[in-house]
Amino acid sequence: MPKPKKGARFGGSASHQKAIFANLATALFEHGRITTTESKAKALRPYAEKLVTHAKAGTLAHRREVLKVIRNKDVVHTLFAEIGPFYADRDGGYTRIIKTVPRKGDNAPMAIIELVKEKTVTSEADRARRVKASQDAPAAAPAEENVVEAVEAEATDAEVENADAVVEAIEDETAADAPEAEEAKKD
């Protein structure tokens, strides 16, 4: 007979832990990002990602499964109408956890958990194009070096002196601006 895992629970009891995660998930889908303790954020991540996966399917049965957890119908509508279709091309990794400064008072490690808003679509065609480009790059590099050497050989002494004068003028301007910048910092 399977036995439940031993150990500490968030909130003390199983029902309280379930309520905590339901409330955290509701806030996450409502606001897009929330600040909570690091351990709660790490525990919330798989919980929230499973709900997003249900929303991606979009069936009535999946909606009812999500409604068992998230009681706010407006948030469920947002989840199924906006968030689920947004991640239709993405297989997992819908959330990110960013560690922040510890909380004042009890010094608990805090984190921000947020929904990832960037689209990352890497199809096989993109991957093949990158592989081909990386294979062609070593062959093209020697040709570019020859062009650079030819251009350097064609440069006349007058052009070199002109370039040196421009570089010196720029250095003089930056040297003149440096004391003014230091005075501005002191003020």
From Swiss-Prot:
Top-level lineage group: Bacteria
Gene3D superfamilies assigned: Ribosomal protein L17
Keywords per UniProt: Ribonucleoprotein, Ribosomal protein
Cellular component terms (Gene Ontology): cytosolic large ribosomal subunit
Pfam family, one: Ribosomal_L17
Family: Belongs to the bacterial ribosomal protein bL17 family.
Protein name: Large ribosomal subunit protein bL17
